[in-house]
Amino acid sequence: NLWQFGRENQEVMGQHLPFHYLSYGCYCGWGGIEPKCCYVHDCCYGKLDLYTYSKETGDLVCGGDDPCQKQLCECDRVAALCFQDNKDTYDQKPYNAENCQEASEAC
C-alpha cells in the first residue's frame, strides 16, 4: 500500500516520498515520463496487499510467505531504489503533464 511504499522510500531516501512525487514528471500520480520509477510502480500495482519487509545491512528485504505480498513488496522496493538512484535530478517544482509528448507505454 502507499503507506508501506512511503516507509520503504524513507528507508532508502531519508524522507517519506510518495506525496512529493504525486505531480512529478509524466507518470507520477496514478496513470501518470521521467523518472520511470512511477510508471514501473503503477504497472506493478495494477497487477497485484500488505506485506512485510526489513532493512538488513543497508538493503531492503521483502519477507513473508505469500508470493503475492512478496511481489508487491518487490514493486515498492524497486521503485524506492529507483528514486534513490535518481535523487540528484529530482526537481521539487511540479511538472505540467501537458508537456508530456510521449504516450504511456504498455505495462
UniProtKB/Swiss-Prot annotation:
Any one GO biological process: arachidonate secretion
Superkingdom in the source lineage: Eukaryota
Disulfide bond sites: C26-C100, C28-C38, C37-C82, C43-C107, C44-C75, C62-C73
Keywords: Calcium, Disulfide bond, Hydrolase, Lipid degradation, Lipid metabolism, Metal-binding, Secreted, Toxin
Subcellular location: Secreted
Enzyme class, broadest EC rank: hydrolase
A GO molecular function held by the record: calcium ion binding
Entry GO CC: extracellular region
Enzyme Commission code(s) on record: 3.1.1.4
InterPro entries: PLipase_A2 (IPR001211), PLipase_A2_Asp_AS (IPR033112), PLipase_A2_dom (IPR016090), PLipase_A2_dom_sf (IPR036444), PLipase_A2_His_AS (IPR033113)
Family matches, as Pfam families: Phospholip_A2_1 (PF00068)
Cofactor descriptive note: Binds 1 Ca(2+) ion.
Job description of the protein: PLA2 catalyzes the calcium-dependent hydrolysis of the 2-acyl groups in 3-sn-phosphoglycerides.
Family statement drawn from the similarity comment of this UniProt entry: Belongs to the phospholipase A2 family. Group II subfamily. D49 sub-subfamily.
Protein name: Acidic phospholipase A2 2
Lineage: Eukaryota, Metazoa, Chordata, Craniata, Vertebrata
